[in-house]
Amino acid sequence: MLILPEITKFMNKFLLWLIAILLVLVAAVAIIWGKELSTLSSLHSVGDNPYLYEMQYKAAYDLDDMIAKEVDTNSELLDYVIKRIGKGIPIKMKSSQVADENGELETIHCTSFQARNAEGEGYLFGRNYDYFKNPTLVTVSRPKKGYASIAVTDMSHVGYGLDKLPTSFMKKVNALAAIYAPVDGINEKGVCMSIMALPHQASQQDTPKPDVGTSAIIRLVLDRCATVQEALDLIASVDVRHDATVGSGYHYMIADAQGDCVVVEFDREDGWKTMLVRKPAGQNAFAVTNHLLSPKYFTTEPDIYVGNPNSHSWWRYETICAFLDEHNGILTTEQAQEGLAKVRWVDLALPNGRVEDTQYSNVYDQSALTLRLRNWNDYDTICKFSLNK
């Protein structure tokens, strides 16, 4: 039978061992997930808006590894993120971007343009992201091997929704996938890139080159390219493959700080070869919506073969081009937002019964390296982000 002093001695040793084990576990977690934990701790809502978030991405991400593994579909991307970031933790991620019963995606009706900045040197890049009312995440990343950037992600693509927000630590974990899933952004060299949907135009490039998916190509450009030409060289070095199960393809606008601007499309009739539509020399502005601009396919009237008539793409294209022409392609930041306001959606009823809105409107300053974001058609509130902090 143990006497009291021996019991006390035993308990003291037990507590010391328990503390030691806990310290080892804490140290292990810090070593394995330190950068991820730091990233998640930086995730916060912007102002009083419960549906707009900002995150400083401090964890490592290996784009070369992603390319080597040829991650291209949404499910492959989520699996890749789970294995790489989760490190064994059973993270659940599911994108809301899926086709309807007709195998189509009738949404994401976006507008992008570049215009000369009337308030100083350089150019502005305007962007409407028209989709459903989902939470939005602005991610600032400063990789050791790559350019710093501000990128915007529709949080529904990484498993969030109005009823699932990153309000607790465990609910924040999915946000780590956002680094691979931007839909537009700007890097420290002033390169901007955005994505617009094109029904029936899901690129399936298939050559010996490595595969890169829909949004990952934007991350690659932001991290690695200082000019439009560098971006085009990068795109030419890979196969851009869009997830066919989503029911939509895409085209991209890329613009740099020197005023070069191009729309990148893919030719469904010729092995999905890349087609380029450049801003004409001497022109101050250039715009794109949700139909093909390549001369081989371009039409002035709605045509289901080259775009989605339900998105009012041709009307939006004519409207934004007329606005840019009215100002000779030279805009202030407020005029850029005014142009976006002319083609935004408020409670747009779709043929499938769903209702779409402009999720956010962005104006990037390609010289000042700033983003002015208006969320959910709240034009009275401007949320500002900068790479110069």
Region spans (language model):
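Non-transmembrane alpha-helical segments in soluble domains
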Residues: 219-222, 232-235, 321
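A recognition module on extended beta-rich or small alphabeta surfaces enriched in W/G with H and D/E
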Residues: 148-159, 179, 285-307
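N-terminal mature-domain region immediately after signal-peptide cleavage
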Residues: 12-226, 240-241, 325-389
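Long, charge-rich alpha-helical interaction segments
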Residues: 301-337
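Short, Lys/Arg-enriched N-terminal segments with co-localized hydrophobic residues
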Residues: 1-10
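Secretory/export targeting leaders with adjacent low-complexity proregions
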Residues: 233-244, 252
